[in-house]
């Protein structure tokens, strides 16, 4: 009975189980304190005190009570017979013990109720903790969704910026094309205006000449002058005067022609500068340089060089109009080639495999991870191949070789390059032969054209002489000239056919149609070159002046 009853609270890791056990046993189901005390007393009576050890039990209880602070339960008898039980002390001790027991029971009940409250608060806090944990997970998911949405919006923004940049480039290209076409249009309008003014002046001259004409005898097959007047008799003074007038007219024509050419050159330079700027802008934007490794690329470059050389040679022998047209056509051709090349590069860039996004514009995570794994595996394979190549190279360098084996290996390494160079040399020689052949054909055609022009000039001089003799009153001289030169008669139909055939021959010569071989090839000497230059100058002058002394180039 002297042992104190202490309450040991459970540990923190077993508090849930302890609380659940307490919740499952409410206060109504717990045994009452009176029942528990009665049971304990009934058990202790039979176990603690017996008739044999009564004195010892009394002594032990007395000692325990005194240690607790109670008064002794034994008192000395008055008779001196010894010590005996003091009932008043016993009753007081029992009462005090009962009071203490009731206090401890009340304190236990209070502790139990407080423990129940603490358990309820703990459950509430646990529910709040679980709720906060769920809210944290939900906020994390929302944050991930917002981050993914932000990334998608950034990707979409980048795509829109790229599209805007492409549209701006397209607009710039279209503006450049419009500007170049406007310059070409202005150039053509100015040329048409000049032609219109010349035709207007010519019409005015013809109308005024018709008004100034008097009634006279018309001569058939008459080659008129530029002013529409009849030519005077040929004397020394008239010849000198006519020569001076001819030189003045030629100088005026040359000056006008030079001015026109200068204006056209300025406009063409502007067009060329604009085209150059466009090409530089396109090339600088793309920054793509492709290496032509196969032989087809060298063949195309050689063909382009041959075309450029032939165009240069043709430019030196053609008139200004033909040179201008050929230059413009070559520039347009180069522009088309560059444009087609850039379109081809764009198509090749568009054909690159891109992972297809889903309906929301997102790439599946599994596909993304597969692509990453594939790239990582490819990187590992590349590293392994590089490592193996390094090891093989070290082994090859470490193995000693003699001079013969090293030379043999070098020859093996260079064999493929030698074969490729030999094939390129063969192709180059074949192209060179073709170029020499075309050059020879061109030279022969130029010589033949010069001879034909010379024959034509002789025929023309004879025809003019014949017409001049027909205009004179000396019929006897006419008959005499007919007997001396029987093959000089030309009808008007033959004259028209010959005059109409001249521009056709000129077009054939300027277009480069030299496939027809001449009947007889003549060697080129210094005198023949000089005669060719004279013939070309005469033919250019005659091409700009018609038989009626009119300028039909404009």
UniProtKB/Swiss-Prot annotation:
InterPro entries: Adhesion_Centrosome_assoc (IPR052300), Afadin/alpha-actinin-bd (IPR021622). GO terms for molecular function: microtubule minus-end binding. Keywords: Cell adhesion, Cell junction, Coiled coil, Cytoplasm, Cytoskeleton, Microtubule. GO terms for cellular component: adherens junction; centriolar satellite; ciliary basal body; cytoplasm; microtubule. It comes from the Eukaryota. Signal peptide: none annotated. It is found in: Cell junction, Adherens junction; Cytoplasm, Cytoskeleton, Microtubule organizing center, Centrosome, Centriolar satellite. Pfam families: ADIP. Residues 508-528 are annotated as: Disordered. The keyword Cytoplasm applies. The keyword Transit peptide does not apply. One of its GO terms (biological process) is centrosome cycle. Interacts with WRAP73. Belongs to the ADIP family. This is Afadin- and alpha-actinin-binding protein A.
